Swiss-Prot record:
Belongs to the glycosyl hydrolase 2 family. NCBIfam families: PRK09525.1 (NF007074). Mg(2+) 1 binds at E424, H426, E469. Binds 2 magnesium ions per monomer. Binds 1 sodium ion per monomer. Mg(2+) 2 binds at N605. The record marks H365, H399 as: Transition state stabilizer. GO terms for cellular component: beta-galactosidase complex. The lineage of its organism: Bacteria, Pseudomonadati, Pseudomonadota, Gammaproteobacteria, Enterobacterales. Substrate binds at N109, D208, E469, E545, Y546, A547, H548, N612, W1011. This is Beta-galactosidase 1. It catalyses: Hydrolysis of terminal non-reducing beta-D-galactose residues in beta-D-galactosides. GO terms for biological process: lactose catabolic process. It comes from Klebsiella pneumoniae subsp. pneumoniae (strain ATCC 700721 / MGH 78578). Homotetramer.
């Protein structure tokens, strides 16, 4: 018989409760809290449980509560237990009080926001006092047990009901249930919840996130009968052939010993309204130990012939209804969605239902830009749909168990989940100080064991995690073995202590590179290809964090996926992370924008390091999300031949055929369609096909830039996407016959007008002016109307990316960061000196030849040579040669920029698009003729940086401007200088015109991590000489 620790021979008064300072003691994880269990609803009707109808015995207490704020628990007046304090006002529950105008949110990554010695926390400990008046039905008071369940309270709380102390709980991220029955009275009842911002538990909650407080998840009342189900463990399993299934059931009853007699437990398994299997058994188990034969428990199994399997691709859920009976009288019914699947590690591979998985994963914090850490079901569904639409199949609950509803949705929509214990001690020195201290084992244990007891019935959870960044120690070792004994159906992972310790079934490093080793002394990170080949190592490798998506990032991402597909034991990973953790704020100047660390006066803080998302805080996608979608897509393509035009397509679906997929293809030349077609795909799981698209590929004379584009779409809507959703795409360049450019008829050379100050070149309505002193093309008029707002100038810098900055900041300079290397090299302060500016009128063109020396002090570090060829048709063909000193670090870019008047026209280009792309992040971009409004050419990263580039462009058309050549470009209403000098995007100011930037070369963005230089050598501008050409016309 399971009995909670609710003995109340002595009920302490208010001051006695506070005097104990339970929140200062890591060994007191709770007082009077009920044992952890799955989500209950206590239906009294089996079919209502089957259909998941609202239960009359489960009631939500969300809504407006009364709230008072105090600087510490000891500053709270005891009269609050019986009446609201004078300063109270209404506040929503759930909420974080920092989002309601009290106290300040704090963002730190590693550093603890409190400066005391564990387990102690500051005496000045912000405290929220919540109160609520409620009533309960007389039947609830008179029969059975009435529980109150808090799904999440940060970080610890005491509970009173009608002025009587009920209990205490720590652990912000797991439900805490208490028995209210002894305290309820007829009519009005008063709940009082005292929440402390800091507790001993805070030392185990040092996650990289905003530190907020309050009742931030739902609160429930639950009425259970006198004899009741108090725990149910459901384990669906498949046989060795993955054909037939069994549902193993263990149910525990809470009742007096006398009442146990005559009770039985039934189980029925449903798919929709069809009952698949059913059974019933009296209490008692064959298990015998020193306690006896477990009279309050029942263990049995149901055989299920050929059940539909659960996977992320095919989330086939059954409804398991567990009932408690006295004879033929139904006392209670509970129900859960379950799935038949078998997760195992065999032959060095993580397998689901016998198939090796490829984890297309992402880390996700519970965060909302308006509500802080309060997420609604609609928010959860929005995230799940976006993940599924972008080819994610897995999510890591970083770094704590999520709200209960999250798992139910993942079961239904189909996402693999790593459920992670709410343990992180990243700021400890050493990091394993607490994880190797036996005095902290009870606190560690409560977080791991209660997570499992609460969530183990969910099929979506395929891996348990012991926590995050807490070093390696005996506490983790002990809990690893507890998990393996108590849930052998799932593997366990833990990265701390080196990612490959004896406390993990999976090598699960964070930010290990594909090839390069990082020989960190304590915990070396080997290149992932090398790691799986180390002597004696047979485990699969799944990166628990990789591809740090901070701002303009995710370079090199396709390299990881090439390795995952090449090496079977490299089974994917979880991108860091899903959404930018910024908060909407009205700033002191009245402006409204997204805030990050330090914007609330929070100290310490880690600035914008909270913004590492694939999506903005409001879930608008970053361009990097498209790159992730493409790399992770479930179809791979190979060009077999060009005439006939044949391709091979491979499906990476493990469990479903292509029953809703169409292959669409098109051949384009210079963005113009030549051929196209579509066909329905009929591939089995893991199937492939070779398809002839054209018997003969015949190209028109002069065809250039010929590409084959393949894409797979879903014509029918699915549970997570609309009709015609694109799931995969790929492009292949096709050979085109060489052709000489069409000869041009010379119209003579433009006129050259010479003065002491300028060269002036005229051709019809075109007039160009070059300043002879500076060498700059300073004016370009068409029909007497000036087009330039600034001269054309060399551009060697970019507004530093987060990856360029790394961890460098004013208080702590990192000389290895790219921005510091460029700064120390003087790149941001170079002085241009024109050392040559010659002009001559030739037979067919007028040539202006200019050379600049870029000086750092007295030293010439860059030489730039421009040859400006002006022709009678109004074209400027610009050939640029340059050279840099070997003492300079690789440059971020080599190009030119200039400002022009806004054209009030869309931007059209022939090149890679449509989204922003960079040299090391362009696998997802397609070569075509694209057109977008000017506003879409900017990516408004919250911390302003270089953005908006489009690579491998052959033609750019915007209003009057027509540019051709081979270049990368951006067109934006913001200067590089303003991007560099502005710290929040909402502070960006409109400028007079629009900046056109044309790059011959541009460095990659990197992204393996954001604190070390992560741009791979092939994407660095290591050359010391360069050449590029572009042609410009303004009509």
């Amino acid at each position: 018989m399971q009995i909670s620790d609710t003995g109340r021979s002595h009920t302490p008064d208010f001051h006695a409760v506070l005097a104990r300072e339970d929140w200062q003691n890591q060994t007191i994880t709770h007082l009077n809290r009920l044992p952890a269990h799955p989500v209950f609803a206590s239906w009294r009707d089996e079919l209502a449980a089957r259909d998941n109808l609202p239960s009359s015995r489960r009631r939500q207490l969300d809504g407006e509560w009364q709230f008072s704020y105090a600087r510490s628990p000891f500053a709270v007046d005891a009269q609050w237990l019986t009446q609201d304090l004078p300063d109270c006002r209404g506040t929503p529950v759930p909420s974080n009080w920092q989002m309601e105008g009290y106290d300040a949110p704090i963002y730190t990554n590693v550093r603890y926001p409190i400066d005391t010695t564990p387990p102690r926390v500051p005496e000045d400990n912000p405290t929220g006092c919540y109160s609520l008046h409620f009533t309960v039905e007389d039947t609830w008071r008179e029969n059975g047990q009435t529980q109150i369940i808090f799904d999440g309270v940060n970080s610890a709380f005491h509970l009173w009901c009608n002025g009587v102390w009920v209990g205490y709980s720590q652990d912000s991220r797991l439900p805490a249930a208490f028995d209210l029955s002894p305290f309820l009275r007829p009519g009005d009842n008063r709940l009082c919840v005292m929440v402390m911002r800091w507790s001993a538990g805070s030392w185990l909650e040092d996650q990289d996130m905003w530190r907020m407080s309050g009742i931030f998840r739902s609160v429930w009342l639950l009425n259970k009968p006198q004899q009741r189900l108090c725990d149910v463990q459901l384990t669906p399993a498949l046989d060795a052939l993955y054909r037939d299934g069994t549902l193993q059931v263990q149910a525990t009853i809470e009742a007096t010993e006398a009442a146990l007699a005559g009770l039985s437990v039934g189980v029925s398994l449903w798919r929709g309204e069809e009952q698949i299997a059913a059974g019933r058994q009296p209490l008692g188990t064959p298990t015998v130990d020193e306690r006896g034969h477990y009279a309050e428990r029942v263990d049995f199994s149901l055989a299920v012939a050929t059940p539909a399997h659960w996977s992320a691709e095919t989330p086939n859920c059954y409804r398991a209804v567990v009932t408690l009976w006295r004879g033929d009288e139904l006392l209670e019914a509970e129900a859960w969605d379950i799935g038949f699947r078998r997760i195992e590690i065999a032959d060095g591979l993580l397998r689901l239902n016998g198939k090796p998985l490829l984890i297309r994963g992402v880390n996700r914090h519970e965060h909302h830009h308006l509500r802080g850490q309060v997420v609604t079901e609609a928010d959860m569904v929005q995230d799940i749909l976006l993940m599924k639409q972008n080819n994610f199949n897995a999510v890591r609950c970083s770094h704590y168990p999520n709200a209960p509803r999250w798992y139910e949705l993942c079961n239904r929509y189909g996402l693999y989940v790593v459920d992670e214990a709410n343990i992180e001690t990243h700021g400890m020195v050493p990091m394993n100080r607490l994880s190797d201290d036996p005095a902290w084992l009870p606190a560690f244990s409560a977080r791991v064991t209660r997570m499992v007891q609460s969530n183990r019935n969910h099929p979506c959870i395929i891996i348990w995690s012991l926590g995050n960044e807490s070093g390696g120690g005996g506490n983790h070792e002990a809990l690893y073995h507890w998990l393996k004994r108590n849930d052998p159906s799932r593997p366990v992972q833990y990265e701390g202590g080196g990612a490959d310790t004896t406390a993990t079934d999976i090598i699960c490093p964070m930010y290990a590179r594909v090839e390069r080793d990082q020989p960190i002394p304590a915990v070396p990170k080997w290149g992932i290809k090398k790691w799986i080949s180390l002597p004696g190592e047979q485990r699969p490798l799944i990166l628990c964090e990789y591809a740090h998506a901070m701002g303009n990032s995710l370079g090199n991402f396709a390299d990881y996926w090439q390795a995952f597909r090449e090496y079977p034991r490299l089974q994917g990973g979880f991108i860091w992370d899903w959404a930018d953790q910024a908060i909407r704020k009205t700033f002191a100047d009245g402006s409204v924008g997204w805030a990050y660390g330090g914007d609330f006066g929070d100290k310490p803080n880690d600035r914008q390091f909270c913004m590492n998302g694939l999506v903005f805080p409001d879930r608008t996608p970053h361009p990097s999300l498209v790159e992730a979608k493409h790399a992770q897509q479930y179809f791979q393509f190979t060009l077999l031949s060009t005439s006939p035009l044949r391709v091979r397509i491979i499906s990476e679906y493990l469990f479903r055929p292509t029953d809703n997929e169409v292959l669409r293809w098109q051949v384009q030349a210079a963005g113009e369609p030549l051929y196209h077609g579509d066909l329905t795909l009929a591939l089995p799981p893991e199937g492939s096909d070779e398809i002839t698209l054209l018997d003969s590929l015949i190209l028109p004379e002069g065809a250039r830039a010929v590409w084959l584009t393949l894409e797979v779409t879903q014509p029918q809507a699915t549970a997570w996407s609309e009709a015609e959703h694109r799931v995969a795409w790929q492009q292949f360049p096709l050979p085109a016959p060489l052709a000489l450019p069409a000869p041009t008829v010379s119209a003579g050379a433009p006129d050259l007008i010479v003065s002491d100050e300028v060269w002036q070149i005229r051709a019809g309505s075109q007039c160009w002016t070059i300043d002879r002193r500076t060498g700059l093309l300073s004016r370009w008029s068409v029909g007497g109307q000036e087009q330039l707002l600034t001269p054309l100038r060399d551009q060697f810098i970019r507004a530093p990316l987060d990856n360029d900055i790394g961890v460098s900041e004013v208080e702590r300079i990192d000389p290895n960061a790219w921005v510091e290397r460029w700064r120390s090299a003087g790149l941001y302060d170079l002085e241009a000196h024109c050392v040559q500016c010659d002009a001559q009128r030739l037979a067919n063109e007028t040539l202006v030849d200019c050379r600049w020396h870029y000086l750092r002090g007295e030293e010439v570090v860059i030489v730039s040579h421009w040859r400006m060829h002006f022709t009678a048709d109004g074209t400027l063909r610009l050939a640029v040669d340059g050279e840099r000193a070997e003492t300079l670090p690789p440059l971020p870019r080599v190009g030119l920029h200039f400002q022009v008047a806004d054209q009030q026209a869309p931007v059209s280009w022939l090149g890679l698009g449509p989204h922003e792309n960079y040299p090391d992040r362009r696998s997802s971009a397609c070569f075509a003729r694209w057109e977008q409004p000017l506003a879409a050419m900017t990516t408004p990263y919250i911390f302003p940086t270089e953005n908006g580039l489009r690579c491998d462009t052959q033609a750019l058309d915007w209003g009057r401007w027509h540019i051709s050549g081979h270049f990368h470009f951006s067109v934006q209403p913001w200067s590089t200088r303003q991007l560099m000098e502005t710290d929040h995007w909402h502070k960006m100011q409109a400028e007079d015109g629009v900046w056109i930037t044309l790059d011959g070369l541009h460095m990659g963005v990197g992204g393996d991590d954001s604190w070390t230089p992560s741009v791979l050598p092939q994407w660095l501008l290591s050359q010391t000489r360069w050449h590029y050409e572009v042609s410009l016309r303004c009509l």
